[in-house]
């Protein structure tokens, strides 16, 4: 399907600041289909985690979208793929008790209203397992795609296409005024690690609740989308508290 040319750049969302991140994809045909979905909707930054090189089947299914594949970047882990981005939106088919999950429409609206100049990652997981808890913990926001109750999940390429098409086509104003950018994900993660370390030293986090509390903390601080000013304040507070404990 060819999209109307005149509608391609009228929504003001700045497609160049969005990256599609595929974590641990297995089927290279799906990677090619994702590239095609990106080219159809005007997005070009594809990041692959856990993939060393693309196989021929990826190029076979890309169909006139080979440039997206040729420019794709490869990362050894999710932290490396997201460290320079400001906000991460992760798609999941399962509702998790420890992660606040947004409806798709809310996620799209939040994406469109993200601060001008912020770099945003759209994170999608492995075809069989989806995103693991550790991967969801690297996101600021987690969302689900609407689907019939009897169908457990979308194909990877379909999930990417639905998300990108919603960003591409739905009307809505661009951000009307400059906002403070969130800190990069690398800086946000450093802050979260300090908070978790303090909670562990205080005894609040222990062996029995470590996974649950850690996921709750990551979900909370992710949704706050800490700015550099927020991060510096929290780091100062928690680092000072840690230093006092050492004395």
Residue ranges and their predicted role:
Residues 1-247:
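Post-transcriptional modification and biogenesis factors for structured RNAs
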